[in-house]
């Protein structure tokens, strides 16, 4: 009791002190009345937390943590859970980009997305729909400028690209994604989604942009793309195989992929590729590639 009250009395509300207070305010091994004293102290000094995503993210993680454990003896009660949720609402950033930035993290601490209730596919779909809703809001409020800013600041570029594509793949949207100079992972997310949902439009974009390499390598390798690359001028073909990722491939292209990677001097990547194939338990003949 004395230690907790000393913490409250001496708190200078620096970032480190606030983190300590948040931990104490939800510590399951403390009596509820002591947690309440810390919670009241935080609520009385809320301006120190306002607009800081660091604390917003911390509170979201705690809400997620306790929502998953609602039936546990050590879980905080409904009143304390409501305190956390109300605190989060009160300190959210006013800036729309900062307020939505957390939705583009690699992991979304949202209690509605509990893994234990869903398989991985459904979990992934829920996360994507959550991000798409944020993209729609940003576009509605501030247009392409909002998408540009969230793309620049997002943690998970690939998932951001997927959300952009799920939102819309109109030609103005495609031109925006291509011309902004975004991260390659964002391009990969966007164009993999486009290729899987509208191949005809993907190929039209490839032709419109004169077989630009970043559009081609964004979807990795597959049989259809590999055949197309073979029709390109030698310099363009070499550029593709020098830069394409070995982490995105299809089983039907493994031989030609290994062969072409060796031709451009990527023997280390070939070994990495074959190790992953072997680890996956696939029986795929790749010996011809080493005889090229």
Predicted regions mapped to residue ranges:
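Non-catalytic all-alpha helical scaffold/repeat segments
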Residues: 1-292
């Amino acid at each position: 009791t004395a230690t907790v009250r000393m913490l409250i009395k001496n708190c200078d509300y620096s970032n480190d002190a606030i983190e300590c207070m948040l931990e104490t305010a939800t510590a399951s091994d403390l009596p509820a009345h002591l947690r309440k004293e810390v919670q009241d102290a935080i609520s009385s000094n809320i301006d120190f937390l306002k607009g800081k995503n660091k604390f917003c993210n911390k509170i979201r993680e705690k809400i997620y943590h306790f929502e998953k454990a609602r039936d546990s003896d050590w879980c905080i009660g409904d009143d304390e859970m409501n305190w956390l949720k109300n605190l989060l609402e009160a300190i959210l950033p006013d800036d729309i980009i900062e307020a939505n930035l957390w939705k583009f993290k690699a992991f979304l601490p949202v209690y509605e997305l509990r893994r234990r209730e869903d398989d991985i596919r459904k979990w992934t779909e829920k996360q994507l729909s959550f991000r798409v809703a944020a993209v729609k809001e940003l576009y509605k409020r501030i247009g392409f400028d909002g998408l540009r800013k969230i793309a620049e600041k997002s943690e998970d570029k690939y998932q951001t690209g997927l959300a952009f594509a799920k939102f819309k793949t109109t030609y103005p949207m495609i031109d925006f994604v291509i011309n902004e100079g975004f991260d390659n992972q964002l391009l990969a997310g966007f164009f993999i989604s486009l290729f899987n949902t509208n191949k005809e439009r993907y190929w039209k974009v490839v032709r419109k942009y004169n077989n630009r390499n970043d559009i081609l390598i964004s979807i990795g390798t597959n049989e259809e793309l590999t055949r197309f690359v073979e029709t390109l001028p030698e310099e363009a073909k070499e550029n593709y195989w020098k830069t394409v990722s070995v982490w995105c491939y299809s089983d039907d292209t493994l031989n030609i992929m290994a062969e072409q990677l060796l031709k451009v001097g990527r023997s280390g990547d070939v070994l990495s590729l074959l190790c992953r194939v072997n680890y996956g338990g696939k029986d795929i003949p790749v010996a011809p590639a080493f005889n090229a």
